[in-house]
Design a protein with these regions (language model features):
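Nuclease catalytic cores that cleave nucleic-acid phosphodiester bonds
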Residues: 2-181
């Protein structure tokens, strides 16, 4: 089975989605963004990428209009019905083992690791079988503190260094998994 990227698009900031879109397009990887609503930036990128793919097909001598119309981007936007964990459930059911999955959602990451997927978060860090229990525990502690009115420190907004860390880790992951940017 071909290598795929799966993105929990509800939890990944727009700037990082752009990095993922460009990498998937450049490497001609199948990449599926899953959310409970359509994301205009992803939809527009898919349209632009489809146009570029068709242009390349024409440049390589394809002339039949039906064949050209059949050429499409390998990037997809899947909109699931709204509901708790509906996007998560879809990703777990659909992503094959060995896929690269990108999410900020720790319980989803645990489910994907159990399935045999490679998982990274939106800050450029890998989720591993060795640290997922600790991350789940930290999440529960923070939730309990919030319920008591004690607010745990939140992550700041994504800055240029954060985007670079994410892009660098994506590059490393794709290289390790047999793809290069």
């Amino acid at each position: 089975m071909a290598f795929e990227i799966w993105v929990d698009a509800d939890s990944v900031p727009k700037g990082l989605r752009t990095i993922i879109l460009r990498a998937a397009s450049r490497l001609a990887l199948t990449c599926t963004f899953v959310a409970d609503r359509s994301l205009p930036d992803v939809v527009q990128y898919i349209a632009d990428d489809t146009f570029a793919c068709r242009q390349k097909a024409r440049e390589h001598g394809m002339t039949d209009p039906e064949q050209i119309r059949a050429v499409k981007s390998r990037i997809h936007m899947t909109v699931v019905q709204q509901g708790q964990d509906s996007a998560d459930d879809f990703i777990v059911a659909s992503a094959p083992a060995g896929s690269l999955c990108i999410t900020h959602d720790i319980p989803l990451a645990a489910r994907l690791l159990e399935k045999g997927c490679n998982v990274m978060d939106d800050r450029g860090s890998d989720y591993t079988a060795g640290d997922i229990r600790a991350r789940l525990g930290d999440r529960l502690v923070n939730r309990e503190l919030r319920s008591w009115g004690v607010f745990a420190e939140q992550q700041g907004s994504m800055d240029a260094s954060g985007r670079k860390a994410f892009a660098d880790n994506l590059d490393r992951k794709l290289t390790k998994l047999g793809k290069t940017i």
